[in-house]
Regions:
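Active-site C-terminal subdomain of aminotransferase-like
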Residues: 1, 8-118, 131
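Short glycine/serine/proline-enriched coil/turn segments at secondary-structure junctions
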Residues: 5, 40, 155-157
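Thr-Gly-centered strand-to-loop micro-motif
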Residues: 35-36, 43-45, 69, 124, ...
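Conserved PLP-binding catalytic core of the aspartate aminotransferase-like
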Residues: 94-103, 108-144, 152-154, 158-159, ...
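PLP-dependent enzyme catalytic core of the Aspartate aminotransferase-like
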Residues: 141-142, 154-197
């Protein structure tokens, strides 16, 4: 049984936003896909998709599904509209991936250590929970920049990181400003540019 978490991929990968498995032609090898309306689609709520029998089994036996409240019709209508829109529009996907590439280039130019990969999510390695929380707090309080800190138990101790995500809505100036602010904070707090990776 192959269960694939595509919450960060639906809407952003593939010709029609169908996710990584669909983009790579592997969807026929996946039994169940988990997605969310809370990221690329801009709403809330999650979903699973798969073979009818599998989805029916979840619907009938999964307590997390049985004892939850359904999404409101207005949210579902918005989700449907968003899915339909992103099936045909490539503007947002193209811009999001271009912005992710610019973010990585800007971080590289300043000497920051992040986990390299093809994803639009850029894990900026910090390696210390207190430092990670301090940086994200300062970014929000003093610079109006929200960055998600990722600490234990989500990741092992010593591998704490900031999860950076450049969206389609960000401009090149936004991205450069963020990296400049980050560089300033590292200098101000005497942090090494090459934190533990």
């Amino acid at each position: 049984f192959t269960y694939l978490d595509e919450v960060h991929a639906v809407g952003l990968y593939g010709d029609n936003g169908g996710g990584v498995a669909r983009a790579r032609g592997l969807l026929n090898r996946i039994d169940m896909v988990e997605g969310t309306f809370g990221k690329a689609y801009g709403l809330m709520g999650g979903f699973i998709t798969g073979r009818r029998e599998t989805v029916d089994a979840v619907r009938s036996f999964a307590s997390g599904f049985i004892f939850t409240t359904s999404l409101p019709p207005a949210v579902l209508a918005g989700a449907l509209a968003s899915v339909e829109y992103l099936k045909t529009s490539t503007i947002e996907r193209t811009r999001a991936h271009a912005n992710a590439a610019l973010l990585k280039q800007s971080l590289d130019a300043q000497g920051f250590s992040y986990l390299k990969g093809e994803s639009h999510i850029v894990p900026l390695m910090i390696g210390d929970a207190k430092c990670c929380k301090m940086l994200t707090d300062i970014l929000l309080q003093d610079h109006d920049i929200y960055v998600q800190p990722i600490n234990y138990p989500t990741v092992p101790r010593g591998t704490e990181r900031m999860r950076l995500t450049a969206t389609a809505a960000h401009t090149a100036d936004d991205i450069r400003h963020f990296v400049n602010v980050l560089s300033f904070l590292y200098e101000q707090h005497h942090l090494p540019m090459q934190m533990r990776a």
